[in-house]
């Protein structure tokens, strides 16, 4: 301990229970509900009144939650869907757009992704309740933080680096927990919520047809 050097790019494994850090990729197994705990939980299910729902925003998380007995999704945070590498550029394009038309063009690229996200989740939940939270955090959280990413965004959107930096500065908030977020964001940019609602309803319609 104390004399091991880990270089950038090397894999490590962290035991979340003990805090132990191990060099390299340690084989893992998926936890199972078994033994006495499984028996006690089955007894509890016969008498409990409380229903337990999960936080999930991906198909895999939804499957895991169902496996462990979740009876729906209590919070599906849609902002997590926007950080995926194959859609973050469209999100940034939407944020940096100067006109409603440009924003709509960027949102039209995001619509199929959102629809597919919701469709997968609704399919796994198979009729169980799903509470979807529309885009909540301040927009600056989706913008690049370092010069390399700023240059990449500026180049891909045909904007000047200074222009992108100025927009990031304009959107930055000292206390984002109380700032331009949630319903305030929806009032300022209703087209974002319109796209998300359209994605939800289209996902439901397609599932019904399937």
Language-model regions: role of each:
Residues 1-76, 80-94:
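Acidic, glycine-rich flexible loop/linker segments
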Residues 51, 61-210:
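Flexible, glycine-rich loop/tail regions that form catalytic "lids" or insertion modules at the edges
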């Amino acid at each position: 301990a104390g004399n091991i050097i880990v270089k950038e790019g090397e894999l490590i494994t962290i035991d979340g229970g003990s805090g132990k850090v191990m060099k390299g990729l340690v084989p893992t197994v998926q936890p199972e509900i078994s033994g006495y705990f499984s028996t006690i939980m089955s007894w509890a299910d016969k008498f409990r009144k409380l229903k337990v729902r999960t936080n999930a925003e991906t198909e895999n998380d939804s499957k895991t939650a169902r496996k462990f007995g979740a009876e729906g999704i209590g919070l599906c945070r849609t902002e997590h869907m926007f950080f995926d590498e194959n859609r973050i550029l469209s999100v940034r394009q939407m944020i940096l757009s100067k006109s409603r038309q440009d924003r709509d063009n960027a949102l039209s690229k995001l619509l199929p992704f959102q629809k597919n996200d919701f469709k997968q989740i609704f399919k796994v939940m198979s009729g169980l309740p799903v509470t979807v939270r529309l885009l909540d955090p301040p927009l600056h959280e989706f913008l690049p933080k370092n010069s390399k990413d700023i240059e990449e965004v500026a180049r891909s959107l045909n904007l000047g680096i200074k222009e992108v930096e100025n927009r990031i500065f304009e959107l930055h908030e000292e206390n984002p927990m109380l700032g331009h977020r949630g319903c305030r964001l929806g009032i300022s940019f209703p087209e974002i919520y319109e796209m998300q609602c359209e994605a939800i309803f289209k996902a439901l319609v397609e599932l019904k047809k399937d």
